């Protein structure tokens, strides 16, 4: 969970901490609707853990979207009624009832969910608001392995985000 920064700042962080991987062959979907980053982060994670048993609906969604680009995959996800119902059942009532009505909202910091996980021998960052998955390189298989690398990368990104935020003020 990260404090959300406008996309130009977010892109700068990824460029410093890793490399975009436009050829990423794992499961990666863009977030194409508001307030869905937690659900999308979970899907981006589940879609990259082949050993994890899934229910028939999720297995069908992952299979159906194989080979699609991230934008199209995101659109397919938003059209899955069963997934929207599950997402909305976990959303606070205000997020459902006020969304799209144009009513003024209290100014709050925005936060965003991002997934870090090992895929194909490298640590990847899967952020549905970024144009591609971000490859953060290989990791030591011993000890904490990819978790240690993910912690280092996220600490670096938080430090850079704090620096960008303090400059903007």
What are these regions (language model features)?
Residues 1-169:
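Cysteine-dependent deubiquitinase/ubiquitin-like isopeptidase catalytic cores across multiple families
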């Amino acid at each position: 969970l990260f404090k959300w920064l406008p996309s130009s700042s977010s892109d700068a962080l990824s460029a410093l901490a890793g490399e975009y991987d436009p050829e990423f062959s794992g499961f990666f979907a863009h977030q194409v609707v508001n307030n869905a980053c937690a659900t999308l982060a979970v899907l981006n994670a589940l879609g990259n853990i082949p050993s994890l048993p899934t229910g028939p609906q999720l297995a069908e969604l992952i299979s159906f979207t194989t080979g699609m680009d991230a934008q199209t995959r995101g659109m397919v996800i938003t059209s899955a009624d069963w997934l929207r119902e599950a997402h909305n059942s976990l959303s606070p009532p205000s997020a459902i009832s006020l969304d799209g009505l144009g009513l003024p909202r209290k100014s709050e910091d925005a936060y965003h969910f991002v997934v870090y996980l090992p895929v194909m021998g490298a640590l990847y960052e899967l952020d549905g608001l970024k144009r591609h998955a971000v490859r953060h390189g290989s990791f030591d298989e011993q000890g904490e392995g990819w978790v240690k690398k993910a912690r280092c990368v996220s600490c670096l990104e938080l430090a850079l985000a704090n620096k960008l935020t303090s400059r903007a003020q």
